[in-house]
Amino acid sequence: MNFPTIPHESNVVSINVGGRIFQTTKQTLSLAGTDSLLSQLATETTRFVDRDPDLFSVLLYILRTGNLPARSRAFDVRDLIDESRYYGIESFLIDSLSNSSQFEPFDLRRSRILQLNGRDSPSSISPTVIGGGLHVAHGSKITSFDWSLRQKSTVLTNFSAVDSLLEISPGVLAAGATDFPGLQIIDLDNGGFVRTTLNWENVTRSSSTVQAIGSSHEFLFTSFESSRRNSNSIMVYDLSSLLPVSEIDHCEIYGADIDSAIPSTKLKWIQSCNLLMVSGSHTSPSGVNGHIRFWDVRSRNMVWEIKEAQDCFSDVTVSDNLSAVFKVGVTSGEVFYADLRSLGTKDPWVCLGEEKKRNLNERRGVGSKIESYGNHVFCSSKGSGIELWSEVITGLVGNASRDVLEERVFRKNSLGKLADSGENKITGLAFGGNRMFVTRKDQQSVQVWQSPSRGISI
């Protein structure tokens, strides 16, 4: 018996863009979404688009892989933006720029300077949740740059100066100051409208100022200090409803107890351990003292505490990927690490620098900043340059498998100019997507660092 032949509809689609033929599949075009031009081309019989074929090839590659091709650096970002909007796939271009896999720390170069309006230098910076954009607090103003860093908008706040800033959802910021009560939730899409103000009611019922802000996927953390500076605490809020969940690290000052007088000025969530790292320090004529505490937010129990006295931290951060805490000593200016598995020991710190040359009579690390991103740690110690610290895997035991605790090996590389270059001291480091943002003392701008081998021309 002979069966009739059913014509097979080919899954391959040919598109003529500016005289050049491109072949792809209907599944690839459907990824663009039903409202996009590419999705419509998958169902049409005549597929001709009078646009630039070179730009189309870049966008088609992004649609297929989710990443920017190496050849994209030959194009101006404005052309790619316009073309992606024409095809209705701008969100794919944004996602490719915010992909942290495109971040190449060993090839970072200064690619752009973001100028700010007014005379105030940046006091706090916060990368956008998605897209590689940036929010900058300078004086009483907050300036926001979109993902392309070419469009900016500025809103005026109620603060005389914004000291803490964090984007908690697209277009919504949490902002606070050390001299103005309350944590304000600011809606940028409504011209800087303050949705609500979160406060901590202390024992003396005085107003409370914000010392630091942090967040996880579920919670918003805020470090408060009473205006009389005799009590401090960390409030935990639900990130979606902004309702209070719990209170941790509550301290009341009694007599000359210096430790309880130190509010936490940095909050870092450790996703792998479900712990919140809080840190704060105090400078007195006798030296610098501080604390680093690790809190289980759900049980409201403090898991570990490191008390800092000799060579206390100037700044501290934690790396989930490296399972370690890093600090830069305020006295020595050297970088130290503490393995998260050894935090129960008396002295968990291991010096990564030249420990033999440490001079505890100097304060070489004052004002130094340290942050982690991916598998790397960035430090602004000893001048205006940036140190990049990366772990060297020496074998399967300990470092690679993380099963056996042993001393780990880190290697230092230098980015930018050295201390004698004449550049101003670094005051802030932040990371988003494939970009590093740097602020410097007395400069009304933000430096953007990016890899020229991966990034498009901005």
UniProtKB/Swiss-Prot annotation:
Lineage: superkingdom: Eukaryota
Domain comment, as recorded: The BTB/POZ domain mediates the interaction with some component of ubiquitin ligase complexes.
Entry protein name: BTB/POZ domain-containing protein At5g41330
Annotated keywords: Repeat, Ubl conjugation pathway, WD repeat
Pathway linked to the protein: Protein modification; protein ubiquitination
InterPro entries with a match to the protein in the record: BACURD1-3, BTB/POZ_dom, SKP1/BTB/POZ_sf, T1-type_BTB, WD40/YVTN_repeat-like_dom_sf, WD40_repeat_dom_sf
GO biological process: protein homooligomerization; protein ubiquitination
SMART domains: BTB
Native species: Arabidopsis thaliana
PANTHER family (UniProt xref): BTB/POZ DOMAIN-CONTAINING ADAPTER FOR CUL3-MEDIATED RHOA DEGRADATION PROTEIN FAMILY MEMBER (PTHR11145), PROTEIN BINDING PROTEIN (PTHR11145:SF23)
All copies of domain BTB, residue ranges: 11-72
WD-type repeats, residues: 259-305, 360-399, 421-458
Function of the protein: May act as a substrate-specific adapter of an E3 ubiquitin-protein ligase complex (CUL3-RBX1-BTB) which mediates the ubiquitination and subsequent proteasomal degradation of target proteins.
Disulfide bond entries: none
